[in-house]
UniProtKB/Swiss-Prot annotation:
Gene Ontology MF term list: ATP binding; ATP hydrolysis activity; proton-transporting ATP synthase activity, rotational mechanism
Annotated InterPro entries: AAA+_ATPase (IPR003593), ATP-synt_VA_C (IPR055190), ATP_synth_F1_bsu (IPR005722), ATPase_a/bsu_AS (IPR020003), ATPase_alpha/beta_chains (IPR050053), ATPase_F1/V1/A1_a/bsu_N (IPR004100), ATPase_F1/V1/A1_a/bsu_N_sf (IPR036121), ATPase_F1/V1/A1_a/bsu_nucl-bd (IPR000194)
Role noted for this protein: Produces ATP from ADP in the presence of a proton gradient across the membrane. The catalytic sites are hosted primarily by the beta subunits.
Primary site of residence: membrane
Subunit structure: F-type ATPases have 2 components, CF(1) - the catalytic core - and CF(0) - the membrane proton channel. CF(1) has five subunits: alpha(3), beta(3), gamma(1), delta(1), epsilon(1). CF(0) has three main subunits: a(1), b(2) and c(9-12). The alpha and beta chains form an alternating ring which encloses part of the gamma chain. CF(1) is attached to CF(0) by a central stalk formed by the gamma and epsilon chains, while a peripheral stalk is formed by the delta and b chains.
Protein name per Swiss-Prot or TrEMBL: ATP synthase subunit beta
Enzyme class: translocase
Gene3D superfamilies: 2.40.10.170, Bovine Mitochondrial F1-atpase, Atp Synthase Beta Chain, Chain D, domain 3 (1.10.1140.10), P-loop containing nucleotide triphosphate hydrolases (3.40.50.300)
Family assignment from sequence similarity: Belongs to the ATPase alpha/beta chains family.
Keyword Cell membrane: yes
Reactions it catalyzes: ATP + H2O + 4 H(+)(in) = ADP + phosphate + 5 H(+)(out)
Organism: Nitrobacter hamburgensis (strain DSM 10229 / NCIMB 13809 / X14)
Gene from which this protein is expressed: atpD
Location(s) in or outside the cell: Cell inner membrane
């Protein structure tokens, strides 16, 4: 329940991003937004704790440099409200819904609180339909569900953001509905690139409005932890509004780990005792509150694709481990694969999807995926023998399996549209039927005569055959 608005209080203490405020009358409710002036800026503080002696402890959504004790603070009577509706499309907003793209105010249909209840069980709906991404390794081995939650796991610099940008390129551009991108604690440069990329490719119009399809909500690396801990909720609120109007929404988050990290930064300042690896004791609760809202209802769907940073490449770290439970499909990026120059560096044996069932994808797709994994697993188990004794000591059967596995490994790579400017190679979108046909043929030994190099960075199997002919002609 909202507390009476316009109650005023005074700042009694400022410790980094945490500010204590004393009120004389009615205390603002937990999660209420209270406001003060910091120079020319409107500074929003969110109530986190009631301390007693009429004092509340709050988390600042912007820098607290310049605040002084005794400064006046007003209670807004509501949680943080952000603009929602088609007026947000093509615009960049910050955590409190203010535009940061210098294109004037956001024309909002409505203002909506960033803290909402998750939909009831009775309102939720599930579909068993595949979202085709055009990326071979994903579509074959860990297919994404429409209206599902997808996690892209990977350490630093293995290609999570490039993969999410390629998914935006392949899925959001072909998708008729609206998309929302929440940039949580990532590089400002990447956010800027994405904004301009959307305008150049026609997904958005400069200045937003008619013809734009994607709303951007950013709280980047340089923002205080309060903003990074809440910006995912602000983006989700925009997406929920579109869903409740009957839209099928795509919701991209880069990066969910930064949401957890920001929570752990403020947790100690709020006086909570840290839990495992120094994370906040409320880690599972915070993650659940966010993830349970990202769901498909009887009105519309949210398909969410989330990049999840893996600290020190350790998937058992509490932050990535907590997010695993909420996902329908996981795409795990592996540094060892990226070191071989195979991009996207998706681990074919470590990526999973509940959609990979013969009842959903069909018998042929399922069998092909399992054959590919079987060949790769066999190669993996033979690697120790190869390292010690060499290829010559393998049986003829094993030699064939290894040769096919190495071809499959290379065929799992493909050039991306968003990487064209770096590589000079045109991007490729591969249909699911072509993907299945290509891998099935390699497993069946139809292309045993082609060299490994023919399968590297191509789209369909026909391109690999062409490349093989070209390589043979050059060698002759």
């Amino acid at each position: 329940m909202a507390s009476p608005a316009n109650q005023t209080g005074r700042i009694t203490q400022v410790i980094g991003a945490v500010v204590d405020v004393q009120f004389e009358g009615h205390l603002p409710a937990i999660l209420n937004a209270i406001e003060t002036k910091n120079g020319d800026n409107r500074l929003v503080l969110e109530v986190a704790q009631h301390l007693g002696e009429s004092t509340v402890r709050t988390i600042a959504m912007d820098t607290t440099e310049g605040l002084v004790r005794g400064q006046e603070v007003k209670d807004t009577g509501n949680p943080i409200l952000v603009p929602v509706g088609v007026g947000t499309l093509g615009r960049i907003m910050n955590v409190i819904g203010e535009p940061v793209d210098e294109q004037g105010p956001v024309k909002a249909e409505d203002m909506r609180a960033i803290h909402q209840e998750a939909p009831l069980y009775t309102d939720q709906s599930t579909e068993a339909e595949i979202l085709v991404t055009g990326i071979k390794v994903v579509d074959l081995l860990a297919p994404y569900a429409k209206g599902g939650k997808i996690g892209l796991f990977g350490g630093a610099g293995v290609g999570k953001t490039v993969l999410i940008q390629e998914l935006i390129n392949n899925v959001a551009k072909a998708h008729g509905g609206y998309s929302v991108f929440a940039g949580v604690g990532e590089r400002t440069r990447e956010g800027n690139d994405l904004y301009h990329e959307f305008i150049e490719s026609g997904v958005n119009k400069k200045g937003g409005g008619e013809g734009s399809k994607c709303a951007l909500v950013y709280g980047q690396m340089n923002e205080p932890p309060g903003a990074r801990a809440r910006v995912a909720l602000s983006g989700l609120t925009v997406a929920e509004h579109f869903r409740d109007q009957g839209q099928d929404v795509l919701f991209f988050v880069d990066n969910i780990f930064r949401f957890t990290q920001a929570g752990s930064e403020v947790s100690a300042l709020l006086g909570r005792i840290p839990s495992a690896v120094g994370y906040q004791p409320t880690l599972a609760t915070d993650m659940g509150a966010l993830q349970e809202r990202i769901t498909t209802t009887t009105k519309g769907s949210i398909t969410s694709i989330q990049a999840i940073y893996v600290p020190a490449d350790d998937l058992t770290d509490p932050a990535p481990a907590t997010s695993f439970a909420h996902l329908d499909a996981t795409t795990t990026l592996n540094r060892a694969i990226s070191e071989k120059g195979i991009y996207p560096a998706v681990d074919p044996l470590d990526s999973t999807s509940r959609m990979l069932s013969p009842l959903i994808v069909g018998e042929e797709h399922y069998q092909t995926a399992r054959m590919v994994q079987q060949v790769l697993q066999r190669y993996k188990s033979l690697q120790d023998i190869i390292a010690i004794l060499g290829m010559d000591e393998l049986s003829e059967e094993d030699k064939i399996a290894v040769a096919r596995a190495r071809k499959i490994e290379r065929f799992l790579s493909q050039p991306f549209f968003v990487a064209e400017i770096f590589t000079g190679a045109p991007g490729k979108f591969v249909d699911l039927a072509d993907t299945i046909k290509g891998f099935r043929a390699i497993c069946d030994g139809k292309y045993d005569h082609l060299p490994e190099a023919a399968f590297y960075m191509v789209g369909t199997i026909e391109e690999a055959v062409e490349k093989g002919k070209k390589l043979a002609a050059e060698a002759a």
